[in-house]
Every structure is written in C-alpha cells, then in structure tokens.
C-alpha cells in the first residue's frame, strides 16, 4: 500500500498516525517531490470511482491562486489530468493506493471500511 502525503499537511499527519495506530503497513511517498504522473492519475481515478474534481486540493494555495474553481468546469478531463500531474500540491491528500482501492483525503470511517 502506498500513501502520497505532504509532510507539513495536518490531515496527512492524522492519516499516518491512524495507519500506525492500526498497525497497517504502508510506503510513504512525498507528493510534492514524487507526485503521480498523468498515466498513474488516470489509473487511480478509474479505481477510485470518484469524480475527477475530487482529486483537486481545493484548499491549497495553488488551487486558489490559479482560480481553479472557475476554470475546472470548462476544462476537459485530459486538461485536468495534465494539470494534476504538473504539481503534487494540486492533488488532494493524503492519497492512499491499496491494490484495487484508492482513497482521496482522510475520513477515518472511509479508511476503516476499506482497510479492514
């Protein structure tokens, strides 16, 4: 299992603490330094079953600076994937990848359900 996180993100810290407390092994990947590429994002999106917009870090500085809330509705999926792949800080985190399961963000109940 892989977990894409940003070390300064409090939500990521909570997620990692939860994984550790539940003795769940994972590979930690720094989303800022080693973010998923476009091909990987397409696979993760398909596995997640979520709308692509859920993969965007809507509370992030880059999201706000680029005014993505206004731009995303007019973007194609290909454009969105390219944008997500361009900078890990645009991607919602933590991003958990476990075989055929993908979780975006940390909601303890969702993680409990999928990982137990």
Residue ranges of predicted features:
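Local sequence-structure signature of Cys/Sec-based thiol-disulfide redox active-site neighborhoods
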Residues: 1-21, 26-31
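Thiol/selenol-based redox catalytic cores and closely related redox-interacting motifs
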Residues: 33-114
């Amino acid at each position: 299992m892989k977990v894409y996180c940003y070390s300064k993100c409090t939500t990521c810290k909570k997620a990692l603490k939860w994984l550790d407390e539940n003795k769940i092994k994972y590979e930690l990947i720094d989303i800022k330094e080693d973010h998923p590429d476009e091909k990987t994002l397409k696979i993760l999106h398909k596995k997640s079953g979520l709308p692509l917009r859920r993969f965007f870090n809507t509370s992030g500085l880059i999201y706000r600076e680029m005014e993505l809330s206004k731009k995303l509705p007019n973007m194609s999926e290909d454009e969105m994937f390219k944008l997500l792949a361009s900078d890990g800080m645009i991607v919602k985190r933590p991003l958990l990848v476990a075989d055929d399961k993908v979780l975006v963000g940390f909601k303890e109940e969702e993680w409990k359900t999928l990982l137990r």
